[in-house]
C-alpha cells in the first residue's frame, strides 16, 4: 500500500521520466482493486484499529465489573505497561510475555478468592468511639503549631512521655484535638483503637468545627469551611507507612461545627488517618535555625484548621444480602457453603453462566467442552 501511494504521488520511480503517465495510470488501475479488497477483508475481520491487550488499569477495572468487586486492588501485581509518547494504550508497545501471563494468572486467582466467602454470615459489626487525646497521636507531628490538644479554646502544652502514659488512661471529653497541617512526611496522625476488624466498608461519624489558630495557641471561630478527607493506612509510624489511600470523599467542616458522617473502605488491620486539604505542610529546617520543623507564617487573622471533639467508627457494614454479589457471580444461588445435590450438573451450568458474563463476543459451543473437562476433573479429585 505504501508503494502504491508513492507511485500515485509521483515519488516513485525516483525519476519522473522513468515511467510514462499512461503506464503509471495503468499500473495503479491494475493494483487498486486487489489492494482495496485485501484492506476491506482485513478490516471486516479485525476492525479498523489494531488489536491490543488491556493495560493493567483496564484489566483491574474489568475484573471489578466482572466479579462485582468495586474495591478490588490487583494493579500493582501486574508489570508496569510500556508507554509510547506518554500513553500506555498503544498496541505496538503493549507487548506480552510469559512473565505477564504468570502475573495475570496470579492476579485473577487473588480476585477470585476475594470474590468468594466461606462464612454463613457476614463479619460481626463493631462500634468504637474515641474522645480527648485518643483522637490523635501522643505527640505533635510537624511542630506544636501543626497539632495540639486544646481545652476551652486554649492550646495545652506538650506532655512528657510519663505524662502521656497517665493522660491516655483518661477519656477527657472536654478536650479537642486540633490539626493545622496537610499530610506530608513525616506524618502519622490517626485515632487510637480505630481499626478495621475485617476488610469492608465502615461508617465514620465525628464532631468537628473549623477554627483559627492565633498567637499563643489560642483558638478562634473559623471564618470559612476547611476541607478534609480520610486516608486508609496501617497504624504504624510514618517510616513504615505503606498503601496509603484517600477514602470517604471530601468533607467540608464548617465554623459553626456539627456532626459529619461518611463511609470509608478499609482492608483488615488498617485505620483511618486525618487528611486536611489545602493547609501547610511543615518542612524540616535543614539549617536548624527554628528547631526541627519550619511552620510558615500565619495568614492575617490566624491559621485555619479543624478541631475534633469525638470520632466513632462502626463496621464492617454488612451487604444488603448474603452471600454478597461477588460470591453469587461465581456460584449463583448455591449459598456460602456451595452445596449442590448435582455437582456435575451445577458445575456445567455455572461455567456457562460465567462464560456468558465474561466473554466479549459469543463463544463457539465446541470450545466449551474442554473447560467442562477441567472443572469435572477438579470435582472428581476434590480440588478446592
Question: Regions from the language model: what does each represent?
Answer:
Residues 2-11, 19-384:
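Low-complexity, glycine/serine/threonine/alanine-rich intrinsically disordered linker
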Amino acid at each position: 500500500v505504501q508503494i502504491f501511494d508513492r507511485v500515485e504521488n509521483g515519488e516513485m520511480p525516483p525519476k519522473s521520466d522513468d515511467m510514462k503517465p499512461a503506464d503509471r495510470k495503468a499500473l495503479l488501475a491494475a493494483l487498486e482493486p486487489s489492494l482495496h479488497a485485501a484492506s476491506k477483508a482485513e478490516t471486516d475481520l479485525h476492525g479498523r484499529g489494531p488489536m491490543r491487550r488491556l493495560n493493567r488499569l483496564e484489566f483491574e477495572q474489568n475484573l471489578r465489573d466482572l466479579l462485582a468487586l468495586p474495591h478490588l486492588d490487583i494493579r500493582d501485581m501486574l508489570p508496569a505497561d510500556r508507554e509510547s509518547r506518554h500513553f500506555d494504550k498503544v498496541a505496538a508497545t503493549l507487548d506480552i510475555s510469559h512473565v505477564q501471563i504468570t502475573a495475570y494468572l496470579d492476579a485473577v486467582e487473588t480476585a477470585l478468592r476475594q470474590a468468594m466467602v466461606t462464612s454463613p454470615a457476614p463479619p460481626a459489626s463493631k462500634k468504637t468511639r474515641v474522645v480527648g487525646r485518643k483522637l490523635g497521636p501522643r505527640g505533635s507531628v510537624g511542630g506544636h503549631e501543626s497539632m495540639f490538644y486544646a481545652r476551652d479554646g486554649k492550646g495545652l502544652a506538650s506532655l512528657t512521655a510519663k505524662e502521656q502514659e497517665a493522660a491516655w488512661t483518661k477519656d477527657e471529653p472536654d478536650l479537642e484535638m486540633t490539626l493545622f497541617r496537610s499530610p506530608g512526611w513525616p506524618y502519622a496522625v490517626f485515632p487510637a483503637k480505630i481499626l478495621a476488624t475485617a476488610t469492608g466498608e465502615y461508617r465514620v461519624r465525628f464532631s468537628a468545627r473549623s477554627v483559627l489558630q492565633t498567637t499563643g495557641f489560642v483558638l478562634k471561630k473559623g471564618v470559612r469551611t476547611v476541607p478534609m478527607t480520610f486516608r486508609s493506612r496501617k497504624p504504624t509510624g510514618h517510616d513504615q507507612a505503606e498503601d496509603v489511600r484517600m477514602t470517604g470523599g471530601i468533607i467540608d467542616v464548617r465554623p459553626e461545627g456539627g456532626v459529619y458522617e461518611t463511609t470509608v473502605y478499609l482492608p483488615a488491620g488498617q485505620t483511618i488517618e486525618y487528611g486536611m486539604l489545602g493547609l501547610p505542610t511543615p518542612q524540616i529546617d535543614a539549617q536548624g535555625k527554628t528547631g526541627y520543623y519550619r511552620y510558615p507564617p500565619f495568614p492575617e487573622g490566624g491559621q485555619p484548621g479543624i478541631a475534633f471533639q469525638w470520632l466513632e467508627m462502626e463496621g464492617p457494614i454488612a451487604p444488603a444480602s448474603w452471600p454478597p454479589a461477588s460470591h453469587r457471580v461465581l456460584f449463583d444461588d448455591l449459598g456460602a457453603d456451595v452445596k449442590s445435590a448435582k455437582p456435575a450438573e451445577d458445575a456445567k451450568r455455572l461455567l456457562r453462566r460465567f462464560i456468558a458474563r465474561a466473554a466479549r463476543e459469543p463463544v463457539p459451543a465446541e470450545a466449551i467442552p474442554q473447560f467442562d473437562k477441567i472443572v469435572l476433573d477438579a470435582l472428581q479429585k476434590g480440588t478446592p
